[in-house]
């Protein structure tokens, strides 16, 4: 088990390192960020002094080496726009993104798992047809379009919900629905498929032959043994919810990390972009690590192999 944990830790560090390296070079393809923060009529001498102070006159290899050295100490530099520590700025926005992502994940589970299980148990029924039809539709509709339509209908026309921002419970409704729609649809289809496969297993047939109540057969025997694919997808979805929050936060003016990252990219605020990628990478890999540990509880054979 110790070797397994060390292996996963090494993989986590490698993923974070490669992510930061890729983004470090990619963000520089967008051009010189200094020109966005200085007057158009600035003298060439002043421009050069400003670039020298920020270290942008150094060769790219030197900039990269300096960046890696500082990143090891959690120092991503100062935001070019906000003039404050980049990592601290990112961490201040992270709670809002986590709140939205966790609320969307809870909505995903509350909708997808019951729909998937009932569709499998009542295979071929009207409920199955409507549930899976809705799931296909949920995967097909783009999130940004759904968000705009919901704002138009529920905020502009009906006035039931706020158009954006972060405040009370009503501010969560539309962003959560938009963020969860695709993932709930995908999880519902996977849950149905996984439960259908398990229902044909011998231990389920044996449980039914013993006369156990259907709720016990489904809840205790079927659902737990169907859970590994669902947990795998849930782990992936949790990480992707953080990425999907970028679009959702932009549409609904949610003051989270996703919106900050988009603004930083548009402004070529390299320190903030790199700090955001670092936080996203660490969060995503930790989620996958937690999912791996959960496998051991669901399937003891996984622990034995580890």
Predicted features and spans:
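Membrane-embedded alpha-helical segments of multi-pass transporters/permeases
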Residues: 16, 20, 24-28, 144, ...
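Pore- or pathway-lining transmembrane helices of multi-pass membrane proteins that form conduits
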Residues: 128-150, 174-178
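Transmembrane helix irregularities
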Residues: 29-30, 138-141, 242
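Hydrophobic alpha-helical transmembrane segments of membrane transport/permease proteins
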Residues: 15-65, 155-174
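Alpha-helical transmembrane segments of integral membrane proteins
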Residues: 2-4, 88-129, 166-306
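An internal, D/E-rich "acidic patch" concept
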Residues: 57-113
